[in-house]
Amino acid sequence: MADGLNRVHYNPSTAQLVEFALLRGEGELTANGALVAKTGTRTGRSPGDRFIVKEPSSAADIEWGPVNQAFEPGAFEGLWARVEAFLADKELFVSDLEVGADPEHYQPVRVTTQYAWHQLFARNLFIIPEEFNRQDKPVWEIINAPDFVCVPERDGTNSDAAVILNFAERKVLLAGLKYAGEMKKSMFSVQNFLLPAQGVLPMHCSANVGKDGDTTLFFGLSGTGKTTLSADPKRFLIGDDEHGWAPGGVFNIEGGCYAKCIDLSQKNEPVIWDAIRFGTVLENVVMDEHRVPNYKDSSLTENTRAAYPLEHIAQRKEDNRGAEPHAVVFLTCDVSGVLPPVSILSKEQAAYHFLSGYTAKVGSTEIGSTSAIQSTFSTCFGAPFFPRPAGVYAELLMKRIESFGSQVYLVNTGWTGGPHGIGKRFDIPTTRAIVDAIVSGELKNVETVHLDTLNLAVPVAVPGVDTNLLNPVNTWSDKALYAEYAQKLAEAFTKNFAKYQVSDAIRNAGPKA
């Protein structure tokens, strides 16, 4: 990006970016010191507008389809040039950042944004290195031009906006989008493509570590509890959303957190509550007349967010890294009310449930999602972000679990006693008690009961949890109806899993329809 007539601010500080954002009318300051910005009509990710350039160096390794849509190299060149021309006379913000808190597996990235608040977001979510690009790797480039309007007939896009990844040229283009989450997820997709070739499993999970150095991972889609459960006052946070698992340890891909704010309370989520202060970006959060954020207000979107650097969390692992995990938790939000609150999985069951990624779209991060809650299967608990075929990630997971001996658990943060609308959702204290028992190792060799239809082993007792909750059939007043719903869920699993080419051992580890 030429530094000609336009003013370019290199590596600006938090205070400078907040000032610029306020002066330029990009946002407002809240009573707690955070910067609130609104993202217009797109208040979540736009999966229909995400593309990967189809070029010889990467084409054979990508699972092309509705998630990874192909974009022509020539069309990309033209669009990139038009966006550069559009930004040529604009004031711009540029930072040299990194993705991946690991000396071997990081990627250097130069982020250029039209908006000051987007630059603040990038500096909060990516890693600000002490010394940029120590290994002198080729640098990735992100350009974010939210005011550029794409023209599908001219640009080859599907709408007025696009997110395009180009692996050959190490470029990410964001045009016509104000929702900042697209920036972080685009670099996550980049690492999800690059890391497996280095023998590293990229994961859509949160991670924390205990005083004794024991690491726990929490996999799950948006709204299932990854951020809430990993922000544990008794443990040290590694990160809340994106990690790599290499032989020998786990590392955060990011340098910050992107926490959901809907119904946020100091009582239930003290770590997140305290992290929202000066330097934090609040996305689409509504304020009252005294500028106090009203976290209950979903009038703009259910998907309200807080973006803050890990430095805002007192109890964190300062190097953003941890040992290999003793415990791995798959968080699922079961809207049918059928799954138990906790199950203990074999490694084959772990691969089955990892590939299935069964959960619900709760406060979905995708545009057009309303509060209607529906069940979904999202491969690897993050289908929208994984460019390679699912089997690549499942095999890496099995390999890591086997070589380290990690124990995997399936934890339901959804409903019990009936489906959504009839049953009730497990409360956070119940799930926390289950997680406490998992991380302390109390569930490692316990007595279990086998649920035949679901093909799951359920502990008969968990410290601090009402025993009646553990076997889901006990929470339903109509036992026949429970059996019917369990059968329906087993059939949904089997139907979804038919597309995977896996060993019989893995296929037979799922529910029995």
Swiss-Prot record:
Record keywords, A-Z: ATP-binding, Cytoplasm, Decarboxylase, Gluconeogenesis, Lyase, Manganese, Metal-binding, Nucleotide-binding
InterPro entries (alphabetical): PEP_carboxykinase_ATP, PEP_carboxykinase_C, PEP_carboxykinase_N, PEPCK_ATP_CS
GO biological process: gluconeogenesis
Binding site residues for ATP: 185, 204, 220-228, 269, 305, 431
EC number: 4.1.1.49
Cofactors: Mn(2+)
Positions of Mn(2+) binding: 185, 204, 241
Similarity-based family: Belongs to the phosphoenolpyruvate carboxykinase (ATP) family.
Name of protein: Phosphoenolpyruvate carboxykinase (ATP)
